[in-house]
Amino acid sequence: VVILLDSITRMARAYNTVERGTGRTMSGGLDSSAMQKPKAFFGSARMIAPQHGGGSLSIIATALVETGSRMDEVIFEEFKGTGNCEIKLDRGLADRRIYPAFDIATSGTRREEKLYRPDQLDKVHLLRRGLHQLPPQAGMEWLIKRIAATSNNDSLLDGL
């Protein structure tokens, strides 16, 4: 099962508005209890053991960042580091119609060593270091061309 949530920030704001508060207000006007249900919801994503029916629950959620709202910053910081992957979108790339429009430097997967063989992981690190040396637009354009020119991840990484 996959749940798409747009956005975890708005969900937390809604709970902050409708839940009975504790009277303890965090920075940005967020009540300290407002994050309990959104955190429990987000924390429910997991692989379910075969003895309990198997399967998994994946949650793909957006979070608002750089909005100028202190509350949004507090909410984001509460969830930051709890997911397996963070993809930060890049407005500059989107404005230029370069897709996928994500910031390569700040996006990534935690525990990527579980996704790649050791030789692949070394090449992924090499790829990231090379992309970090390029401006975002040039890096994404180069990566898109390389992906289009190869048939699979091994071919892409072997070509580095």
Which residues are covered by each model-predicted region?
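P-loop NTPase catalytic core
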Residues: 1-160
